[in-house]
């Protein structure tokens, strides 16, 4: 199971992203194992213009959603404390996304190196991609 992070979606949907980068990302979004998480949807829709939000929602409808049960919020807080104990400062939504991935035993696919740091303090499985294109 794969959880596609916000960073891939942003680069894939941004009109200014180079086509080679979009071609690099597309197989991940089309992978049958690809899933969304509610915090990722929130991050993407938060700043989207109305027409962009409609397009995103249409794309999101094609992927299964990993739920964020109430226990995951506590797990995210615990993860944040573990990171802080190792001197890592991680934003709250990244902790929540990581906790969702851990809860569902999904591999998080991302360009965001902060998740590699989170993986140092947990069992988080991360596929850290490098931007090509």
Regions found by a protein language model. Name each.
Residues 64-111:
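Active-site neighborhoods of divalent-metal-dependent phosphate/nucleic-acid chemistry enzymes
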């Amino acid at each position: 199971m794969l959880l596609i992070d916000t960073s891939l979606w942003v680069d894939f949907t941004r009109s200014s992203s180079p086509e080679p980068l979009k071609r690099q990302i597309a197989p991940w979004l089309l992978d049958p194992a690809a899933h969304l998480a509610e915090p990722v949807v929130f991050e993407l829709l938060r700043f989207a213009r109305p027409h962009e939000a409609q397009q995103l929602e249409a794309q999101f409808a094609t992927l299964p959603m990993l739920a964020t049960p109430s226990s995951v919020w506590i797990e995210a807080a615990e993860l944040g404390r573990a990171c802080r104990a190792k001197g890592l400062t991680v934003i709250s939504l990244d902790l929540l996304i990581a906790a969702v991935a851990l809860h569902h035993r999904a591999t998080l696919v991302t360009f965001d190196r902060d998740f590699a740091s989170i993986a140092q303090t947990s069992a988080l499985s991360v596929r850290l991609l490098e931007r090509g294109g």
